[in-house]
Amino acid sequence: MAFQVKIHQIRAFVEVARQGSIRGASRMLNMSQPALSKSIQELEEGLAAQLFFRRSKGVTLTDAGESFYQHASLILEELRAAQEDIRQRQGQLAGQINIGMGASISRSLMPTVISRFHQQHPQVKVRIMEGQLVSMINELRQGELDFTINTYYQGPYDHEFTFEKLLEKQFAIFCRPGHPAIGARSIKQLLDYSWTMPTPHGSYYKHLSELLDDQAQTPQVGVVCETFSACISLVAKSDFLSILPEEMGCDPLHGQGLVMLPVSEILPKATYYLIQRRDSRQTPLTASLITQFRRECGYLQS
């Protein structure tokens, strides 16, 4: 008879992988370490594969373990979503929604939508992950994010995800008040200054970099920031220049520390998409939240 993986073995395996140790996972699962070790051992024997390398300071996944983790974590997230879907359809409007946001969306669109949604559904927990799409691909694949709103530019993900265009944003060049570059009227006049940019992997900034390369107007980016806030802080408090959404000049948190440079060149707009796994199924509450984001995007673009 073929080996049948049990759900408690999947939970045990995923938690050990996430915690990096039997001890940490046993605390999270409220199981004894011997019982947890036995569950993992039975799983490995049943699969006829070693899933973990055991070391004195913990465990790490083998290649087989990495592959199994992709499936196992998705199974648990799909099971959670299925349970929440049934409860929500029965009128129990609670649960958790996990979403990803590009930094610009977090500062503009997100606060209005999330505050309104929270007022309507105070029992629903919303977890928000901020960053570029490349930083949340694995979470989307594994079902740990229900959706993200982000930029996307020619990558290998078309077959995995759906991309629904929501809105466009204009970008501009910014500096701090009193910067010596104020008065410049072209990108070429700015090339000798220090520049900082968010990481350019698979996003608007990759498209922008390729476009500027083609025009021989590529700034020398000396500092690449993994977070949008770090990039903004460098611009506001030093002599770095950067390319950011135009709305940053009106942002109540940062607007007074940023000056937009009116160069003659028009920078490309960034297109933001609603991005989901192709095989994902939305719970009623997730569908409701997506609808509210669509409506807010419509208001902003009208």
Functional labels for PLM-detected ranges:
Residues 14-32:
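Short helix-boundary/capping micro-motifs
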Residues 44-63:
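A short LG(V/I)-centered, amphipathic sequence patch enriched
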Residues 94-155, 225:
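Central regulatory/effector-binding core of bacterial HTH transcription factors
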Residues 109, 174, 181-182, 259-302:
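A late-sequence structural motif
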Residues 132-145, 151, 201-259:
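Hydrophobic hinge/microswitch elements
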Residues 157-164, 169, 229-278:
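Beta-alpha-beta core module
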Residues 161-195:
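Flexible hinge/capping segments at coil-to-helix
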Residues 181-182, 187, 193-215, 282-291, ...:
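Secondary-structure junction motif
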